[in-house]
Regions:
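Conserved beta-strand positions in repeat-built beta-propeller and related beta-rich domains
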Residues: 4, 9-15, 56-62, 105, ...
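Beta-propeller fold detector
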Residues: 30-36, 77-84, 88-91, 141-145, ...
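Ankyrin-repeat and related helical/solenoid repeat scaffolds used for protein-protein interactions
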Residues: 186, 201-252
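A generic tandem-repeat structural signature
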Residues: 14, 27, 34, 41-71
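Beta-rich, blade/repeat-based domains predominating
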Residues: 1-6, 37-53, 85-117, 147-162, ...
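Short loop/turn segments that connect beta-strands within beta-propeller blades
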Residues: 23-27, 70-74, 134-138, 177-181, ...
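A short loop-to-beta-strand structural motif that recurs across blades of beta-propeller domains
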Residues: 18-21, 65-68, 129-132, 172-174, ...
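Long terminal segments
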Residues: 241, 252-258, 264-267
Length: 269
């Protein structure tokens, strides 16, 4: 669930092939189904990214298409995320191995975000790419991470329009700067953390976590130094964190998937 323009909350419907908005003021829901020509019993809408211009980006993971909904008109634009990738035409089927390979073996989207210009960015966890869709032209561009098959996932955009993401297979945090179209990567100090999300706070530090440990990591990109925080509860399976920049000090909220709890971290420095 992600907040959008006008205070609306946007909810991907996962295997229900669509997205839903909720207006807290009226307590009303509205649902937009996927376009029928791109929908089947394997359709998965797992992520959503509201843009500053009021449109909403969300990927259909099975068809490898990115939708852009305009709630005012109800129009949905469709953008192939991997235009040159057609495994079904080669007789290879559409099932892609969702695991580490020494070489990239296909494409699978795992994370989407919108920048200040309403462009969409997405993570290609299987192909090791960061993708961008130009909001004005619809052009799709893939940028390969420096580490081969790094496993990027759960992307976010900072105040400078830089993209931050976990590199799950490379055990690193990655950043893509659209101004230079260059990457930077920072290796986590503890093996097998498997960074999942990555989000920057108002001080410039970047927070990440991995579902294979119970560690929350804070990165100072200026020095490359990490600080690790061990959660008091073990076997939490961390897949999502969020940074609250409205408080002082800032707060980091952590979803403990296996334990059904939410943790809050307030750094003292």
């Amino acid at each position: 669930m992600e907040p959008g323009v006008g205070g609306l909350l946007w909810i991907p419907r996962f295997r229900q092939a669509g997205i839903t908005s909720f207006d807290p003021r009226t307590e009303k829901f509205q649902t937009w189904p996927d376009l029928p020509e791109y929908t089947d019993d394997r359709s998965i809408d797992a992520q959503v990214a509201p843009a500053p211009d009021g449109t909403v980006w969300y990927p259909n993971l099975d068809s490898r298409t990115l939708y852009r909904l305009d709630p005012k008109t109800g129009h949905t634009g469709v953008y192939p995320m991997y235009p040159d990738f057609h495994p079904e035409k080669a007789g290879a089927g559409i099932i892609i191995q969702f695991a580490y390979n020494k070489m990239p073996a296909g494409h699978f989207t795992y994370g989407v975000a919108a920048d200040s210009k309403s462009n969409a960015y997405f993570c290609d966890i299987i192909g090791g790419n960061i993708g961008r869709v130009d909001a004005e032209t619809g052009k799709v561009t893939l940028f390969k991470t420096p580490t081969l098959n790094s496993g990027p996932r759960r992307i976010s955009i900072d105040s400078q329009d830089r993209a931050w993401f976990g590199e799950y297979y490379a055990n690193s945090v990655g950043m893509f700067d659209p101004k230079t179209e260059k990457f930077k990567e920072w290796k986590a100090p503890t093996p097998w953390v498997g960074p999942y999300p990555a989000k920057q706070d108002k001080r410039g530090d970047v927070w990440t976590a991995g579902m294979s440990t119970d560690l929350i990591l804070r990165l100072d990109p200026r020095t490359g130094k990490f600080v690790e925080y061990m959660l008091p509860t073990l076997d939490t399976n961390i897949r999502h964190i969020d940074v609250d920049n409205s408080s002082n000090p800032i707060a980091v909220w952590v979803a403990e998937v296996h334990r059904g709890k939410i943790a809050k971290i307030e750094p003292l420095d």
